[in-house]
Amino acid sequence: MAELACFCYPHLENDSYKFIPFNNLAIKCMLTAKVDKKDQDKFYNSIIYGIAPPPQFKKRYNTNDNSRGMNYETSMFNKVAALICEALNSTKVTQSDIASVLSRVVSVRHLENLVLRRENHQDVLFHSKELLLKSVLIAIGHSKEIETTATAEGGEIVFQNTAFTMWRLTYLEHKLMPILDPNFIEYKITVNEGKPISESHIKELIAELRWQYNKFAVITHGKGHYRVVKYSSVANHADRVYATYKSNNKNGNMLEFNLLDQRIIWQNWYAFTSSMKQGNTLDTCKKLLFQKIKRESNPFKGLSTDRKMDEVSQIGI
């Protein structure tokens, strides 16, 4: 995750702003600079290489002292920054909005995946600039539309029916901020269209999850799609979701946190996010992840549980 101010800076033109991507050398200069505390939140002028991000975001970049940040010296950083600017410059951002836009926390890996989709000649985003920019604006929280299958970050499709598409995320192969754990495995489920979904299509998805992904929890980050993650990583997701929710709320970037369909979401996660939306502390919310919560009733009593052992998935073991 990183703020949009880590990728670009605004330049006032008439009554709106044009966004310009940072270059690698300007960032590198900022990372070595000594800056007064009072200037930590201001864009840094490197003199030689142009404007750089505010020094308060130093930890967002990979350095000798911090291996958890973005690999900003890669060509992928340049591509992501340019794509963000292209999308923002297709809209009108006024002075009253600029602070909240730049402080918005976005998924670095999501944006890299959109670059990869753009470069894939077989992908619809390669052929449609309008759909590409729409996908980016959704990814950076500049659009209130949810991420659907057409505008999704992408990955490897492992399941699809009339209503849903399930993707295996390919973060292990990323350049900008790769997942370093070789055992990482995670999925995302997007809706194919933003319209009501029939019971039969929901039932198909639940059956697929129950039998093929029984070692995983179905959660949501509140953005209109589902994530299918290992139970061992749920607490980490909770920390990130809570921090992003609070940060966006504090900076005035509050979008509606979508709890999604309670029949699909893991009941403990539904309790966690509901508690978070009520304004409770992180510790109070996280306790709900480890309590035994029983569903009031089986939402799909016709869904058979009669499966032979060799039909039950070993994914995630």
Swiss-Prot record:
GO terms for cellular component: host cell cytoplasm. Its cofactor is Mg(2+). Coiled coil: none annotated. Keywords: ATP-binding, Host cytoplasm, Hydrolase, Magnesium, Metal-binding, Nucleotide-binding, RNA-binding. ATP binds at residues 107-109, 188, 221-223, 227. GO terms for biological process: viral genome replication. Its EC number is 3.6.4.-. Residues 205-241 are annotated as: RNA-binding. The active site is at residue 225. Signal peptide: none annotated. It is an enzyme of class 3 (hydrolase). One of its GO terms (molecular function) is ATP binding. It is found in: Host cytoplasm. Homooctamer. Interacts with VP1; this interaction is weak. Interacts with NSP5; this interaction leads to up-regulation of NSP5 phosphorylation and formation of viral factories. Interacts with host DCP1A, DCP1B, DDX6, EDC4 and EIF2S1/eIF2-alpha; these interactions are probably part of the sequestration of some host SGs and PBs proteins in viral factories. Participates in replication and packaging of the viral genome. Plays a crucial role, together with NSP5, in the formation of virus factories (viroplasms), which are large inclusions in the host cytoplasm where replication intermediates are assembled and viral RNA replication takes place. Displays ssRNA binding, NTPase, RNA triphosphatase (RTPase) and ATP-independent helix-unwinding activities. The unwinding activity may prepare and organize plus-strand RNAs for packaging and replication by removing interfering secondary structures. Belongs to the rotavirus NSP2 family. This is Non-structural protein 2. It comes from Rotavirus A (strain RVA/Human/United States/DS-1/1976/G2P1B[4]).
